């Protein structure tokens, strides 16, 4: 989850991702978040990069990856997002994902 506050410290909203947020990068009023493992529900559809409008928490984009996304970066103009995926082993021994560099255009 990501908790967002105003500059005066008052709580604004909470954004709840479907998996663990591994890293967050910012460009203006948007945030790109790397979403990785979900050890509670094993929801592998949660893996990927999510782009959020920081003004209201609206999800602008979601870019799915097969494996957990470990790192993310967003360009200064907010138009491009890069992410690093890594493989993971599921509880039943299946390997999902691979070591990959992803570049997405918004």
Where are these regions (language model features)?
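Repeated scaffold domains used in trafficking and secretory/extracellular systems
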Residues: 19-26, 67-74
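Short, solvent-exposed loop/turn segments at conserved positions within beta-propeller repeat blades
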Residues: 40-47, 91-98
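A short beta-strand motif characteristic of beta-propeller blades
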Residues: 10-15, 58-63
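Residue-level signature of beta-propeller blades and closely related beta-rich strand-turn architectures
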Residues: 37-39, 85-87
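Short loop/turn segments that connect beta-strands within beta-propeller blades
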Residues: 6-10, 53-57, 106
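Hydrophobic beta-strand positions that form the internal "hydrophobic ladder"
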Residues: 31-33, 81
